[in-house]
Structure formats: C-alpha cells, structure tokens
C-alpha cells in the first residue's frame, strides 16, 4: 500500500516525514538537510525552491517570494496584508476577487499556487527516498487558521498533485510526536508553538484507553500574525534606524539592501540564542554621491531581548485564555512542549517557564515535531497505525445573525470536530417568501462585530404568519475544520446549502482581535444582548396585541382601544432608543393597558390563544421549543431577475 506522508508547510521552513514500521523518518532533501526553506524564486524562466532560491535572493529580491503562508486565504484590504506590503521586496497585489496575490514578472499568482511549489518539493523529496510515487498526504496548519486558510491550503495540495487526506493543527501534530516516545499513562500537555509566522497554544489531554493512545484537544488559542518573521523585522528596523543615524540614509527604499539586511538579521538572531553578542557586518550595503557605505553594528543578546520583549509577552495572553477555556490552571499541566524555531530563543524559554512554573521539555525537535506528528496521522488514516485516536477542536464560535442583530452561536469554540449541529429558526414578517442566512465566525454577541463568512438565500417559503415557518439551519464541520452550511424549510423540504469558500475567510489579525475584543467588551456585549432581547419582546408583544385588538374589535370600548394604542405608540418610541429600563417600563405599561381587554376576551370564552401577548412572543408563535426568532433579509425575486 502506498504511504501517506506528513508535511509541515511552514512560514519559514517546511519539512516532510513518513512512518516506516513503528518509527517515523524525517526525510532529507536533495541538498541533504531535513528542513527546506519555504522560499520560491523565479529567475530566467526557471522556478527555484528552497535553498537554491534562498542563495540567490540578494541578487533577485523582487522575484524571490518568502513568508507566503502569511498571505494564504487573506483579502488584499486586510490590515495585516497592508502592513506586509511595506515589509517585503516583492509585489503584493489585489486579485479580481479581492484576495491578496503576488506579482512576478508582470504575472499575478495566488498564494496557494506558490505554496504548491513548496509542497511539490516535499512530494519529490519523499518520492526520491521511498522510490515510489506519492499522492496522499497529511498537511499541517496553525490551529488558529480560519476556514478560508484551511481551504486554501487544501487547494495548494491539489495544485501540487497531492490528495490531502487531512488538514491537522500544528500543535496537535506536535503532541502526537511527543506521545510516540512517552511513557504509558494519562497526562495533560501544553503545546507552545511559535513558528516563523504564527503562534498557537493548545492544551491536550493524552489518555490510555484500552491500549490505545487518545489525544483530545481541550482548547486552542493563538495569534496568526505573530512569529519569527516579526522578530526579524524588529531587528531589521533597529539596524535601519542605526544606519540612518550614522549615515543619514534610509535603506528601506532599496530592495537589494533590505534583502541583505533580512538575511543578516535572521543570522544574528540565531547566533544570539547561543552567544552573548554578534556583529552585523554588511560592506557596500549602498552608495551615494560620496561613495560606498558600509553597515557595521554590534548587537548584544540583551539588546535583541529589549527589541522583542513585547512580541514574547504577546504570546502569554493566548496561553491564559487556552488554560481558562480548558478549565485548568498552569499547575495542572504535566509537560510543556516547545515547537517552532523561534522557541530556541532563551527569552522565549524563560518566559514560558515563568508562566507555566516548569521547565519546558527539550527532547522534542522544534523544527521536526510537526512533520513527525503529521506522518503519524497519515499512518493512522492509511491503516498502518491503529493505536492512536485524535480528537481536535474548532477554534472559534460559528453562528448566524438573528433578530435584533444578535449573533446566535450554533457551534461554540473548542467544540470537537468533526461535528454537525442544527437549530430551528423562523421568519420575522407575515407571509415572508424568502430569507437570507448570514453566517458569522467570532466571539462577539453583536453579529456585525464578528466576521461575515458568507450568505445564501432560502426561497419559495409558503405564505404563513411570522414565526410559523420552521427553518432548520445546519452547520457541518469536517475533520479538516472546513464548513458546509445548509438551511431547510421543514414544511416543504426545500433546502439550500453553501460551502464557505476561500475568498470569504477571516484575516488572521481579525480572529485574534475577535477573541480579545470579546473578553475586553464582555460587559458591553451583555448590555447589547439584553437590549436586543427586550426590543424583540416589545416587537412581539405589539404584534400580538394588535392582532388581538382586531379579532375582538366588537368587545372593546373606544377608551380601552385608545389607551392600548397610546401605550403601543409609547413603546414603539422607547424601542428606538437605547434605554433598556425605559423599554421594560413601557412594556409593562402596555400589559397593564391591555389587561382589561384580555380579561374580557377570556371571559367571552375565546381562550388563552387570544391573550397570547401576555406570553413571550417567541413562545406564542413557535411550533418548536427550539425555534429562535430570526431577522432575515427579505429577498425580492423581481429584483433578482
């Protein structure tokens, strides 16, 4: 049977591994190294990948692409993309669909297309070692990658000629690698993954269940725009400023100089993990009318730490949230695993040790662990390994917009995947012929403050009073974390569905910002939710009372009718403002005004149905206890033609 390889498609470096028997082999590339730079260059009609691309980067900066993973599945207008444009020598452009693409030699290319070149290199490396064709692979992504980015990664695999059998999260893969050599018994581990472009932390429970190792992800958090590249940029900015002070010359306008600076900064950063100081010496970095200029700067480890301390501190908040979501304290963690090349920095190791109260393990190779874990999962999927069970989670809440602009979650964050959940909603207007389902991802209770992933229409709903149609919305997330959403009219059986596509995903910064905003604005969100609820209650009460008034017209005096209409008018005005208590008071006033009429109706034997306004409007109209009032956009079929 053909092997399923494991690929760590990294921002800075990539790695490929395969399981042979009960051992995992990390495969050396043609250059003899176990990791390959994630760099692609276009030169004289030739495509260079890996070390050969890196070697010529200084002389060909505009056509040498690196850190493409930071663009995958993103929109051009995202703030993080705009920030990147000023930091890289190659050209980032806006595609026709609004995505961030790159342009080389007047040709626009999508990030998955470029990432496919790296995957092809990994595929060829594995084929050369195994001596056979390879088509199946497990590819890793940051745990906090959104639906768009996961889909784009699968697309890259397809372009590379690979059948991506599974997309798995990098920290989870690292835990699989750690579990290979671990002693039997149950344990809870924290995987701290600071790579070239992304940061993730996952809390994972490893249990022995009838001789099978079960890896259950309890929670995950992260920042998908924080990694080693940002540490490099901090050092580059410092070197540029030092040169400007000394020579009164800004190197940022010179792509060739910036490429040399990038290489020197990366080299200096690595050296300072073992040395106390290093020298950056770049002769002939540039020239002006006075002649050539040279850059010579000595950097100490303490200087590098001062420049990057804020970046390291940014990793701690996600760690706190991950522990909180898992319902654990730092002292409950048995082992801390460091993954990603940036974790070799002494300041990172010290910060992690201080937070978790224990020294991180050093026996897991931070550059190779993710590929090793992917290879293990590949062996599980191909049936070569049967004693491992992996249970992963989705990182953010998924839901739809309901009445009052509220985000109604259908699948909560840190829900185990694959999963499928449904909820029944209804219409907001009488005889509403169609609804628009708006799908959001995020932690805010205000739908508009989350990210709109996509929307679709369910049409041809038979005429019915509002609240009567039963519209079942189903979210289905597969093991790759990729979503399908459907809406079904339970009355007619008519169904419409959508797969969230790569051009409608979240930007990395938005995801991280959503969770942070949700925590910082929890009180504000609660206030909004309460206001939306009381407005919905007022709307439902008015609708039901007006209907009851019309039905019992012959039993109501003009004075009673006038009193109720005045109370309705007062409530409608109050509902337009943001005073929760005032709306509540006007609601009670309406109830009191309607009370004599409801007593007459009851006495006349018309039953409790006419007095429905005394009950919650949602309950009065819903045929199912799980029905939620939803404010759907009405679709005018004539406008669509």
UniProtKB/Swiss-Prot annotation:
Pfam families: HSP70. The keyword Transmembrane helix does not apply. SUPFAM superfamilies: Actin-like ATPase domain, Heat shock protein 70kD (HSP70), C-terminal subdomain, Heat shock protein 70kD (HSP70), peptide-binding domain. CDD domains: ASKHA_NBD_HSP70_DnaK-like. One of its GO terms (molecular function) is ATP binding. Residues 605-621 have a biased composition (Low complexity). The modification Phosphothreonine is found at residue 198. Coiled coil: none annotated. Residues 605-626 are annotated as: Disordered. It comes from the Bacteria. PROSITE patterns: HSP70_1, HSP70_2, HSP70_3. Induction: By stress conditions e.g. heat shock. Keywords: ATP-binding, Chaperone, Nucleotide-binding, Phosphoprotein, Stress response. Acts as a chaperone. Belongs to the heat shock protein 70 family. NCBIfam families: PRK00290.1, prok_dnaK. This is Chaperone protein DnaK. It comes from Psychrobacter sp. (strain PRwf-1).
